[in-house]
Amino acid sequence: MKKVLLIDRDGTLILETDDFKIEKYEKLVFYPGVFQWLGRIARELNYDLAMVTNQDGLGTELFPEDEFNAVQDFIVRTFAGESINFVGVHIDKSYPHENLPTRKPGTGMLTQYMQGHYDLANSFVIGDRITDVKLAKNLGSKCIFMNDGRNLGAGETGADNATTLQPYIAIETRDWEQIYNFLKSLEGSID
């Protein structure tokens, strides 16, 4: 059965900005090492890759969708140019207070991975927010937590926090090389 890496965008593939919106090219900076090490994961290891991101209020006057889409398309094309291809790109546009099932940590936009074609127990969510860890819990997976200590997303996980979610964290790192080495070490040790 296939395995998948469900990878957050902002703070994981690209650097997070102070206003948590990347709708302009000037704000776009790719995460250090992401092309080299995610590229090796894509070429050498047996994982499908999917991008999963919450984009609060996308499509509103404050966060125009056409500007976002131009940058988003550039991001996806840049990864593809490095032979890093995503089987899916999943973008939730809602605000946290809307509590929609499609918003991480909800699994509503990821049902295609939950229909028995993917081995979620041996798959990973990779992200920098507590919501990414809780998403892993909700999927029956583990999280590779790119923890920067800011506790981002903690207000969206109910009673769960970094301590209560610790059993769902496979490793904590801020380094794509460590992620590659961790996943490589699992080769042959997972059914």
Model-derived regions: residue spans:
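Active-site neighborhood of HAD-like aspartate-dependent phosphohydrolases
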Residues: 1-49
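Active-site flanking residues adjacent to catalytic metal/cofactor-binding acidic residues
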Residues: 7-9, 53, 127-128
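Residue-level signal for short segments within beta-strands and strand-turn junctions
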Residues: 15-17, 93, 147
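Surface-exposed cleft-lining segments at the edges of enzyme active sites
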Residues: 19-27, 59-60, 96-99
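Alpha-helix N-cap and loop-to-helix initiation/capping positions
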Residues: 25-30, 63-70, 104-105
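Substrate-recognition element of Asp-dependent hydrolases with the DxDx(T/V) motif
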Residues: 34, 38-71, 86-98, 136
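Asp-based, Mg2+/Mn2+-dependent phosphohydrolase catalytic module
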Residues: 66, 73-85, 98-125, 129-191
